């Protein structure tokens, strides 16, 4: 997309059907009039001006007639163009938060730079892994602007390389074809003195679960001399923290995915951590060990997202309840359970109620002593709470 062809006054104008009563950057299709008259056909993903029925200014942003989210407002300032300077300002602001305020460079060379709406760039996520920027697109318009975004990122880190992608369901919803480059070979990042091999382009997010950084460190504080069970261990983050920084006596990691277990074993070796990894379905494995009465002092349960569909939330909660019940039965009396959900459609209140139900079914008591979310490089706006998706609940199981 050429950002220099049209001034802001020459952009297509999209009119709303009703008065806008929210500052949320999303405007849904049902609220938007179809382009007509002088506006003519408006290309999906292009930048448009947005006005109310009476012509009152709303903002400027990305338009997509095929998406449920028809408009993503990027600025409410009538005199602010969506150009390279705009992206430079937004990315610099985000960089200042991560480096000057949060000072993440003291802790890691891998962090989230752009967290979509929270950083003023709806439809875009940017993660940094050492010298590689990984861009994930949730809006066709952001995908079409990727060259501009990359050029700004190169201003921050001139020696960087890039990988970008959009998940299949996003491409379908947004009606665009995201052509990703060849993924880079796995490489190393560091976090809190530990090393991890990351693989952007693998099927598990952008390469590593950056959102759990603070929770990994927090969990390790409870592991000294303990036996630890890491369910849905993925590439090994929680278990490796528990064994190295936490000085756990014994760590067992369970995951069904052979690919991520290979990565977990490599990460354990990088950090000289002796960890037992088992490829298994957690439901089957936990049911199999139950008759023996085997328990662990610390259990982590961090499954992948269970649903993207509002109609399936109740089903997801039932699955969470079943796996939490089994996990609680594997916790030694007085032990610790860290149970997590990255399913944004499941509210914190509903997740906590699920934990209550699971404890009752397991014949245990769950004493919640801390509730956390994503790491601080995943901020959220109070008027766009979708960015606050992760629930990490620390419980003592009695």
Question: Which role does the model predict for each range below?
Answer:
Residues 181-398:
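Rossmann-like S-adenosyl-L-methionine
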Residues 114-127, 143-209, 217:
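Non-catalytic substrate-recognition/targeting regions of SAM-dependent transferases
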Residues 105-110, 171-173, 375:
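Short Pro/Gly-enriched beta-strand edge/turn motifs at strand-loop
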Residues 83-90, 141, 145-149:
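Short amphipathic alpha-helical segments
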Residues 131:
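Phosphate-centric recognition/catalysis
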Residues 85-89, 93-100, 158-174, 220-246:
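A short, charged
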Residues 1-124, 128, 184:
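Non-catalytic accessory regions of SAM-dependent methyltransferases
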